[in-house]
Amino acid sequence: MLLLELKKTNQTLETIHFIGIGGVGMSGIAEILYNLGYKVQGSDLVENYNTKRLESYGIKIFLGHAEQNITNVSYVVISSAINPKNPEIKEALERKIPIIRRADMLAELMRLKCSVAVSGSHGKTTTTSLVACLFEAAGLCPTVINGGIINNKLTNAYLGSSNYLIAEADESDATFIHIPSTIAIITNIDPEHLDYYRDFETLIGAFRSFITNLPFYGFAVCCIDHKIVRKLVDEITERKIVTYGIDSEDAHIIAFNINTDIASSTFDVKISLPNVLGTTIIEKITIPTPGRHNILNSLAAIAVGIELDFGIKAIKNGFNNFKGVKRRFTKVAEYNNASIIDDYAHHPEEIKATLATAKNIANKQNGKVIAIFQPHRYSRMQYLFDDFMLCFADADILYITDIYAAGENPIEGITGRSLVDKITKRKHHDKANFLAELDDAVGVIIDNAASGDMIIMMGAGNISSFANELDGRLSSSGFSCHTVV
């Protein structure tokens, strides 16, 4: 039954329970359902920003997973990250409580709206946030379900009043191809989630379906600077596709005259749409976040805005109002006039982009780049080991911790130390070091940080919490640290 149909009935709404409600994707859907008037509760192993936020709304949160948590619930929502042996899943199966995948619940929400789905291996969260800002500047108020905390809203999801919904579409388990979107964005396609897809061609095929499943009146927005995306665009003839890029002269939307610093990026845009005579130039667009990759993300948002006739003024205002996304090159502190950056980069391509941005800024400040990386998941490290060996070139000094398991079992020979050993042995980096304990990063910063340096703390695990606690850790060691966030 569609949620809208259920909403129309006068029956008492039954309780929806989220297993792993603190996850960024799960918490967003839970918040939207709660704001729509549904009874929502959930469980997670530990308290975090998302669980605290949901609790502040009055949503019941259980810490820990247990059979009794799903007493008196009518539906259970899970994501692909939840272990099938979870006691709440086992209890739901025993009691024949319907178990709904997160992607299916998202699809139900999107089915009621004109939806924009943002996918790609990297850049989804920032792009989703940028698209949302442009919609708001155009006088629309979209519902947004994002994969990260939007600084403008201090949440990853919010209920709007218009008929538009903008969502980050997670490609990790192919469920994104079933999302009923009207507009689809593909930022890039790289080898990722191969533990699920098994090979790269299958992953590419999923993105092909993501576009071809659009209704005939919809359109896709694709970055053809990325060669795999370009090839895909060339192969698809049955759907309208708007392209963008920086290096691709044949793209419909191109950025040029690019300038970037630690706090922002400024650029001009040339727009040459198919079946539209002439070229439009938008001068001096500014976004409050650095990096070439973020300019590309902005171009995707511009493509949507142009196609929906938002107007140049609304596009510029939307970017002016954008305040970034947490954990996307977020400056959290300063020590000894060096900037400490918290970043979500956990894939080799993301690491390259983050370090390239840091290197560009450090060079302007006569500083160096100190990278502290916490690998995430044994399976990712195993599939992309060779790529991880080659992605740290822009770090002047490199420290790698052991792997954050994220619930996975160890894989023999796949460790943070083995990565450092291979990097050193093959001479891919002459200053690569293994960091046995994350706590040792305090000493690394004290010993190495100098004025103008960029200290990049990267990963999808608990390194973010560590980065945000550095002021206290350094102070307790007798050193002064200025907190930025």
Swiss-Prot record:
Q: What does this protein do?
A: Cell wall formation.
Alphabetized UniProt keyword annotations: ATP-binding, Cell cycle, Cell division, Cell shape, Cell wall biogenesis/degradation, Cytoplasm, Ligase, Nucleotide-binding, Peptidoglycan synthesis
Query: What residues does ATP bind to?
Result: G120, S121, H122, G123, K124, T125, T126
Protein's organism:
Rickettsia peacockii (strain Rustic)
* SUPFAM superfamilies, A to Z: MurCD N-terminal domain, MurD-like peptide ligases, catalytic domain, MurD-like peptide ligases, peptide-binding domain
The gene it comes from is murC
Give its E.C. classification number: 6.3.2.8
Please report a single Pfam family linked to this protein.
Mur_ligase
Q: What family classification does the UniProt entry report for this protein?
A: Belongs to the MurCDEF family.
- What catalytic activity does the UniProt entry give for this protein? UDP-N-acetyl-alpha-D-muramate + L-alanine + ATP = UDP-N-acetyl-alpha-D-muramoyl-L-alanine + ADP + phosphate + H(+)
Q: Pathway membership of this protein? A: Cell wall biogenesis; peptidoglycan biosynthesis
Task: Please provide the Gene Ontology terms (biological process) for this protein.
Answer: cell division; cell wall organization; peptidoglycan biosynthetic process; regulation of cell shape
A GO molecular function term, named singly, is: UDP-N-acetylmuramate-L-alanine ligase activity
| Location(s), subcellular | Cytoplasm
Q: Which PANTHER family match?
A: UDP-N-ACETYLMURAMATE--L-ALANINE LIGASE, UDP-N-ACETYLMURAMATE--L-ALANINE LIGASE-RELATED
Could you tell me which HAMAP family the record lists for this protein?
MurC
Q: What is the lineage of its organism?
A: Bacteria, Pseudomonadati, Pseudomonadota, Alphaproteobacteria, Rickettsiales
Naming one, the record's GO cellular component terms include: cytoplasm
Name of this chain's protein = UDP-N-acetylmuramate--L-alanine ligase
